Amino acid sequence: MGSSVYITVELAIAVLAILGNVLVCWAVWINSNLQNVTNFFVVSLAAADIAVGVLAIPFAITISTGFCAACHGCLFFACFVLVLTQSSIFSLLAIAIDRYIAIRIPLRYNGLVTGVRAKGIIAICWVLSFAIGLTPMLGWNNCSQKDGNSTKTCGEGRVTCLFEDVVPMNYMVYYNFFAFVLLPLLLMLAIYLRIFLAARRQLKQMESQPLPGERTRSTLQKEVHAAKSLAIIVGLFALCWLPLHIINCFTFFCSTCRHAPPWLMYLAIILSHSNSVVNPFIYAYRIREFRQTFRKIIRTHVLRRQEPFQAGGSSAWALAAHSTEGEQVSLRLNGHPLGVWANGSATHSGRRPNGYTLGLGGGGSAQGSPRDVELPTQERQEGQEHPGLRGHLVQARVGASSWSSEFAPS
């Protein structure tokens, strides 16, 4: 693989990583059903993947050219991608622990896992990621080693900027890989294994003698589906990053082995960066709420088609009904937290916390409504078939939104 092919593929990955993960953050921003503790960690993971596309990949392309630079400047370029990798690892670990608590001790979940605590954990994860990734900047580097070839080519105090020339391989293997990549991955493997074993045991108990007050079988199955989706993301992370680390291990432990050819190194680097692209596809394929919100964003903001917003499988459609005096009528979808308008924007902060309201004036535009109205679900369905009906008001009974319900199988 030539350098021009490598650069072209890297740029394509960068664009896809930015677009896909911006879509994830956008979906969480506009859909209140996605605004929960677990998705705080998902957004943190998406932010790291956006930074890979914006910064890490351009840095990697720059380093691949072997340009002349001050050693510590080159070192910062080389280490920055390690910061983002570490942030992704910590986000995945936090998600695994969050799902473990949700399944093992569901009655205590809301008390233990709060938004404030989640944001604090995310902040700590990012601080630790910078500390671990930038450790070579503090002295664990090759800058003190004199390279006659670099001095001859680049001049005194400057080096040929290549990753292995500035970052020591013992740091990459012992510290970065063994301590902060492999160990967290094994921990996540153990957590998800315990999640599935606990869920299996609970499902068997429900079949034999269901106890009053326990979660229903369908709720637990949704939790398991959620855990499977996130376990897939962890598995893909390992699949994308382990080849590069395995090559580093061979380089470090087998001094007599032939160094990996450039095409293999390029392929391993591309595979590691491609991990930043795959997560949005997993969300879209496995998580119904994300999939519906992605469609809404693309159709409304990319294709410029105005259509009703869907959340949790229920349509938030505008009911064109008003009285003969022209007074406004609104449709409230019960069971939801603060929601979104039909055009995808957030509701007013003064809305009731148990639902969102679509106000329709005489002109049919969404606006504030003086009163909420409720109708049977059957009439709502009939109203969709006969949009010209006047005076029919609809109540769409939507169950309380929970994070696990987003993961209900399609």
From Swiss-Prot:
PROSITE patterns to which the protein is assigned, alphabetical: G_PROTEIN_RECEP_F1_1, G_PROTEIN_RECEP_F1_2
Cysteine pairings via disulfide bonds: 68-154, 71-143, 74-161, 254-257
Gene Ontology biological process: adenylate cyclase-activating G protein-coupled receptor signaling pathway; apoptotic signaling pathway; astrocyte activation; eating behavior; excitatory postsynaptic potential; G protein-coupled adenosine receptor signaling pathway; G protein-coupled receptor signaling pathway; inhibitory postsynaptic potential
Subcellular location as annotated: Cell membrane
GO molecular function: alpha-actinin binding; calmodulin binding; enzyme binding; G protein-coupled adenosine receptor activity; identical protein binding; lipid binding; protein-containing complex binding; type 5 metabotropic glutamate receptor binding
Biased composition (Basic and acidic residues): 371-388
Compositionally biased region (Polar residues): 401-410
Transmembrane stretches, start-end: 5-29, 40-63, 75-97, 118-140, 169-193, 230-253, 262-285
Highest taxon of source: Eukaryota
Residue numbers on the Cytoplasmic membrane side: 30-39, 98-117, 194-229, 286-410
Keyword Kinase assigned: no
Tissue: Expressed in striatal neurons (at protein level).
Residues that carry a glycan: 142, 149
Pfam families, sorted: 7tm_1 (PF00001)
Free-text description of this protein's post-translational modifications in UniProt: Ubiquitinated. Deubiquitinated by USP4; leading to stabilization and expression at the cell surface.
GO cellular component: asymmetric synapse; axolemma; axon; dendrite; glutamatergic synapse; Golgi membrane; intermediate filament; membrane
Assembly: Interacts (via cytoplasmic C-terminal domain) with USP4; the interaction is direct. May interact with DRD4. Interacts with NECAB2. Interacts (via cytoplasmic C-terminal domain) with GAS2L2; interaction enhances receptor-mediated adenylyl cyclase activity.
Family membership noted in the UniProt record: Belongs to the G-protein coupled receptor 1 family.
Notes on the domains: The cytoplasmic C-terminal domain is necessary for targeting the non-ubiquitinated form of this protein to the cell surface.
Function recorded in the entry: Receptor for adenosine. The activity of this receptor is mediated by G proteins which activate adenylyl cyclase.
Name under which the protein is recorded: Adenosine receptor A2a
